[in-house]
């Protein structure tokens, strides 16, 4: 019965042709989840830096500036592509930067209270987005296929690729607003939240890479994906959004102790 309800809802949303993406809706969900887990001290600090803007409202800043040539140096921060038989700790960081070094830079810049407010705000907005990217598994995909971009698939008969399926197609066709999606996530107790928040940035990178490897194993080149794929993997989408938000809150709370 659960599967039937899911498929009916999913097919109805697909028919209306919504254009919602992980890069928008997903990042806003992560911001919304994080906002609810901030300490009072962190809330006050963020209010001063962001002039009252919510995390959800600034979560897509890093994507919005991509078209501006002045910010091209930050393009490589959105992902890290790792050779299939390697872990991040086995490789040399790119000279252009990557998702991990980008997050580290953002944390350092926001943490230093001597930096100009303008700089701290810029890197704070980047940080909120990059923690979200870290939890989209294909942003920690394989070097050989550019994080799944070269792994061609079909999505409901239209051309796509594994990266796009996870970046856009599934959330696009599910059709919820970010507030609806955030509210639909499982309720967790304090112990469960604490468990999710454990670990370091590198631990979370390895976790996302492990999930990415499972996603690679779940498809074949040219495969036609549809309802059953979303039903199988939607729980992982929700889990990654929730983890991203809870861990973003942890990072921010530690920045403003």
Language-model segments: which ranges?
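N-terminal, motif-rich segments that launch catalysis or mediate targeting to/interaction with membranes
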Residues: 18-130, 137, 142-257
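Sec-dependent N-terminal signal peptides
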Residues: 3-13
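Generic cytosolic/nucleocytoplasmic N-terminal low-complexity/intrinsically disordered segments
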Residues: 1-2, 17
């Amino acid at each position: 019965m659960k599967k039937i309800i899911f498929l009916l809802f999913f097919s109805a949303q697909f028919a209306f042709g919504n254009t919602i993406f992980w890069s928008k809706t997903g990042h806003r969900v992560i911001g919304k989840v994080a906002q609810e887990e901030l300490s009072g001290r962190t809330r006050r600090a963020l209010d001063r830096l962001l002039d009252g803007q919510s995390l959800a409202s600034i979560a897509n800043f890093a994507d919005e500036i991509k078209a501006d040539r002045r910010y091209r140096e930050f393009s490589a921060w959105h992902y890290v592509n790792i050779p299939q038989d390697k872990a991040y700790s086995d490789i040399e960081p790119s000279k252009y930067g990557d998702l991990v070094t980008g997050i580290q830079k953002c944390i350092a810049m926001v943490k230093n209270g001597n930096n100009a407010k303008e700089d701290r705000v810029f890197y704070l907005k980047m940080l909120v987005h990059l923690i979200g990217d870290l939890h989209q598994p294909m942003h920690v995909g394989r070097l050989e296929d550019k994080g799944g971009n070269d792994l061609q698939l079909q999505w409901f008969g239209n051309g796509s690729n594994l990266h796009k399926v996870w970046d856009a197609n599934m959330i696009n066709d599910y059709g919820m607003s970010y507030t609806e999606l955030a509210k639909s996530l499982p309720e967790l107790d304090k112990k469960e939240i604490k468990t999710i928040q454990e670990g370091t940035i590198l631990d979370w990178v390895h976790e996302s890479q492990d999930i990415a490897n499972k996603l690679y194993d779940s498809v074949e080149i040219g495969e036609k994906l549809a309802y059953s794929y979303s039903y199988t993997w939607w729980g992982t989408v929700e889990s990654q959004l929730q983890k991203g938000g809870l861990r973003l809150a942890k990072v921010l709370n530690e920045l403003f102790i």
